[in-house]
Amino acid sequence: MAGGRRGEALVGAGLAALLCALHVQAACPDATVTQELLKDGFHRDLLVTVELGAAGEDAGGCVVAARIRLPPGIYVDPYELASLQQHNVTKAVLIPDAVDVEAPEYLAADLLVLLYMEPDPRCSCCFRAALPVHGRYHRPADGSEEALVVLKSPQVLLCCCHNHFAECRKPAEVEAPCLGKNVGPCRWHSLTHKPAHEELILQVPVGLRQHSSLVCVVTLLSTALCATLILTAVCKYGHF
């Protein structure tokens, strides 16, 4: 008799745990992240969209951000970003905030960007933001006129004023302010998500190695010609 009651208790506990897990799964937003590159050439716009699913309607009061790691092949111009933030076009934090925009790809380092998302008026559970990115100079290649820069899917971060999604979040090691909430760092949490695509590939135009000699000769001739024209003008019209 005691064994039967013990078995019933175990079954009841198992059902309770299962129902609790199902409740948590239903309460957690099924986040989906999409990345898209706009424009062509070296100067592009990275459009990031986060869809929180049906449970995302409870995200009111939360700040949503995308933590993006940019590889050495691309960068964000901090001066351009400051101008955009001044006009409330794009809001982001660069880590580190000092970026060498002149460095080539093989001398640059990864760049971490915390991109604050804005609610998408076309979707009640969606957030989106665009980040201007620029391709760096790459070494000349053999046989290919394009270098491939791989962008991994960003991490989704939440900064909430309430306890919504508390069971869905994990503390994230990010020191950045919750936009519009305070001026100091706040506690960010990462949200489990599924990327629409694991990675995004950016094609950057590069020169061909077999053209190196021709480029050097043309550059030297152009430099010599310009220097000669300048010296001629100085000697002819200069007052000594």
Predicted feature residues:
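Cleavable N-terminal signal peptides of Sec/SRP-targeted secreted and luminal proteins
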Residues: 5-25
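Non-cytosolic ectodomains/luminal loops of secretory-pathway membrane proteins
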Residues: 20-199
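C-terminal single-pass membrane-anchor helix
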Residues: 1, 194-240
